């Protein structure tokens, strides 16, 4: 079967050329696989479990792209033999029809549904050799997708996956760079100056605290507060007083007051957990990609509004996160007139849309994918012969869309994503990233032993009908097992559950927090907790 013009079949190619090309591809593939393996080993060595899982999901995405490529290769010839009418083939084209001679409109239209064959046959590149005879032309019809268009679609999917992974890594890198500024604020919490300034026996009027002064006043006016929140995300999205107040509220709600808890390291762990979600192209995002390709026909400007929507969503999310901080400050002001010690907010899901903090992550994941789609589409159309003339008739407009997408990516990575990592900790529940591997293993062992003891108690019930019931042994408590695992700063016995989290989950309810009089008397901690955490360090240790 004859190949395309200017090309040769494999039987007409020298064996040394085939061997050289094959060897280069194999060496590059093995080198990439070895590099990913080394990276995974480094994550395991330094106990970066979340990043290791993110790497595994990245490998899964590359495998998915490989499966798609394989399907495109296998089904290329059968799909190119599927014929449709010319009327159907000329509807919803991404570019204006033109005639081959003058480049203007005409009846001799060239189909450009994600493909153009270019000026001459020398531009054609196929995954497999095309059929020698156009079956559909004999029937007066056109092919559903030609071999050339399927090849270009295959290239675009690969470029999209690469840019999504690249944008995810950039987002994680810039977010951690921004969060490094918060580390010095976390270090100040261990100083005597901070402990003296936030002495539990010290009282202040609520309206005199820095947090209330920053977020109330003119900012509390309805309508104006949204404008203030919108502009605040660009200049002072997170200040020192915001960080310290949210930190204190998290500790009071989920731990016990006075703990030396490394809140900054906890946020970093939570961010790594979220990175596992961001780096993956979920089924919902693939559906969004298919929807954009479906709507990308001439006349509605899909690519234009697609470059604007991510920026609008990011600004909306950033404004909402700033509003959450302002609403918590307003609640402190309305709840009590005198603050004892450090002012602390009360975490709750009620501050977020539909009581779902995880929806914020989905919106950011969506905008990240849309930005990657836009950049991948730009690179793909510019690098593919014929498509540049189709999609970039006004190159200045195309460059403006790319600049807008890059600005949205920087805004997401350096401002919105770190703000999300901090503010979403103010939900009703802690993230599981607070537990390390040793603690999780101890909990698993306790669960296994609890099942075994339950079976033993069920068997003893038959023997205890005439006598007393069985008495649980000393080792049936998870705290007992975790004590054997070693006194660590992030063990569950050092991390009592939040009263709000237990109330919402149907667990044991605790009385509401009360502010004692400012006479130097301090509320005593639970004796059960003091027995396990006298002066414990709640910092997470990722290196051993």
Swiss-Prot record:
Native source species: Hordeum vulgare
Highest taxon above the source species: Eukaryota
Annotated keywords: Calmodulin-binding, Membrane, Pathogenesis-related protein, Plant defense, Transmembrane, Transmembrane helix
GO CC term (a single one): membrane
UniProt region (Calmodulin-binding), positions on chain: 437-458
Disulfide bridge partners, by residue number: none
Family named by the database record: Belongs to the MLO family.
Topology versus the membrane: Multi-pass membrane protein
Domain notes: The C-terminus contains a calmodulin-binding domain, which binds calmodulin in a calcium-dependent fashion.
Extracellular topological intervals: 1-15, 81-154, 381-402
Protein name: MLO protein homolog 1
Transmembrane segments: 16-36, 60-80, 155-175, 285-305, 306-326, 360-380, 403-423
Ranges for region Disordered: 485-544
Residue numbers on the Cytoplasmic membrane side: 37-59, 176-284, 327-359, 424-544
GO MF term set: calmodulin binding
Record-level GO BP terms: defense response
Keyword Repeat: no
Keyword DNA-binding: no
Location within or outside the cell: Membrane
Function comment: May be involved in modulation of pathogen defense and leaf cell death. Activity seems to be regulated by Ca(2+)-dependent calmodulin binding and seems not to require heterotrimeric G proteins.
Pfam families reported in the protein's UniProt record: Mlo
């Amino acid at each position: 079967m004859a190949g395309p013009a200017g090309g040769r079949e494999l039987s007409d190619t020298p064996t040394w050329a085939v061997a050289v090309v094959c060897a280069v591809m194999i060496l590059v593939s093995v080198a990439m696989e070895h590099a990913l393996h080394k990276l995974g080993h480094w994550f395991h060595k330094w106990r970066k479990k979340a990043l290791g899982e993110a790497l595994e999901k990245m490998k899964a995405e590359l495998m998915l792209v490989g499966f798609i490529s394989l399907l495109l290769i296998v089904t290329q010839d059968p799909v190119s033999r599927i014929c449709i009418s010319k009327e159907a083939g000329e509807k919803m084209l991404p570019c204006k029809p033109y005639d081959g001679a003058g480049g203007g409109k005409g009846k001799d239209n060239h189909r450009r549904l994600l493909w153009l064959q270019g000026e001459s046959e020398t531009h054609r590149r196929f995954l497999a050799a095309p059929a020698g005879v156009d079956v559909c032309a004999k029937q007066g019809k056109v092919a559903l997708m030609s071999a050339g268009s399927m090849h270009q679609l295959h290239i675009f999917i690969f470029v999209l996956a690469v840019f999504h992974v690249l944008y995810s890594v950039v987002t994680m890198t810039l977010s951690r760079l921004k969060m490094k500024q918060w580390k010095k604020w976390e270090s100040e919490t261990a100083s005597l100056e901070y402990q003296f300034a936030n002495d539990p026996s010290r009282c202040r009027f609520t309206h005199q605290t820095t947090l209330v002064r920053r977020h109330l006043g003119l900012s509390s006016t309805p309508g104006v507060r949204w404008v203030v929140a919108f502009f605040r995300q660009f200049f002072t999205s997170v200040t020192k007083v915001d960080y310290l107040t949210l930190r204190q509220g998290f500790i009071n709600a989920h731990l016990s007051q006075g703990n030396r808890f490394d809140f900054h390291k906890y946020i970093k762990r939570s961010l790594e957990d979220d990175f596992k979600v961001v780096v993956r192209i979920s089924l919902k995002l693939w559906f969004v990609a298919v929807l954009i390709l479906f709507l990308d026909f001439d006349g509605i400007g899909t690519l234009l509004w697609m470059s604007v929507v991510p920026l609008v969503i990011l600004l909306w999310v950033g404004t909402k996160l700033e509003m959450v901080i302002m609403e918590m400050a307003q609640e402190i002001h309305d709840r009590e007139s005198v603050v004892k010690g450090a002012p602390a907010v009360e975490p709750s899901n009620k501050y977020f849309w539909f009581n779902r903090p995880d929806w914020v992550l989905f919106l950011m994941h969506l905008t990240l994918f849309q930005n990657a789609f836009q950049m991948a589409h730009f690179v793909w159309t510019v690098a593919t012969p014929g498509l540049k003339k189709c999609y970039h008739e006004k190159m200045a407009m195309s460059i403006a869309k790319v600049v807008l997408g890059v600005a949205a990516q920087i805004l997401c990575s350096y401002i919105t994503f770190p703000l999300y990592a901090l503010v979403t900790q103010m939900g009703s529940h802690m993230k599981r990233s607070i537990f390390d591997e040793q603690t999780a293993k101890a909990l698993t062992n306790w669960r296994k032993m609890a099942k075994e003891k339950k079976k033993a108690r069920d068997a003893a019930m038959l023997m205890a009908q005439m006598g007393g019931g069985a008495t649980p042994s000393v080792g049936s408590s998870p705290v007992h097992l975790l004590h054997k695992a070693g006194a660590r700063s992030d063990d569950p016995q050092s991390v009592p559950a939040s009263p709000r989290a237990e109330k919402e989950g149907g667990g044991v309810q605790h009385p509401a927090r009360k502010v004692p009089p400012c006479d130097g008397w301090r509320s005593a901690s639970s004796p059960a907790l003091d027995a396990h955490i006298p002066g414990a360090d709640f910092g997470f240790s990722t290196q051993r």
